[in-house]
């Protein structure tokens, strides 16, 4: 019985298969291209293996400058009881610094102005980055 397991045997149809494989093709698919691994491209990033391109942040100071101006202009309009959001925020900073070692109370208006002002600033910077980079890279 041990001899039957030790002898090489082939399953009919698999051992000596003469079936040739043809690449899958369809009229719905583009012509087949060999997929290239970007990590294996010679000299793609100076011989180092990276998963992201080196300039992934795509930092541009135009976005920061225009975004800050784009937020300071509307937040400086006196729309809240004759005062602007920027003015209220900076005034609340001054009143909280008047008693400096003591932190602002949780009921202080400082927290409302801080969160509102920075939320508007970060939204303006985010949309500015999307719009500026989308325009320079021809997304729209």
Curated annotation (Swiss-Prot):
| Domain of life the protein comes from | Eukaryota
Which GO annotations describe the biological process of this protein?
photosynthesis, light harvesting in photosystem I; photosynthetic electron transport chain
Q: Which UniProt keywords apply?
A: Chloroplast, Membrane, Photosynthesis, Photosystem I, Plastid, Thylakoid, Transit peptide, Transmembrane, Transmembrane helix
Where exactly is the transit peptide annotated in this entry? Answer: 1-51
Q: What is the first-listed, main subcellular location in coarse terms?
A: plastid
List the NCBIfam families.
psaOeuk
Record function comment = Involved in the balancing of excitation energy between the two photosystems I (PSI) and II (PSII).
Give this protein's Gene Ontology molecular function annotations: mRNA binding
Q: Which residues cross the membrane?
A: 61-81, 110-130
Q: Which family does it belong to?
A: Belongs to the PSAO family.
Intervals, Lumenal, thylakoid compartment: 82-109
Which species? Arabidopsis thaliana
Where located? Plastid, Chloroplast thylakoid membrane
Q: Which stretches of this protein does UniProt put in the Stromal compartment?
A: 52-60, 131-140
Q: Null-mutant phenotype, please?
A: Reduction by 50 percent in state transitions due to a disturbed balancing of excitation energy between the two photosystems. Short flowering delay.
The protein's topology relative to the membrane is: Multi-pass membrane protein
Q: What is this protein called?
A: Photosystem I subunit O
**Keyword Disulfide bond annotated:** no
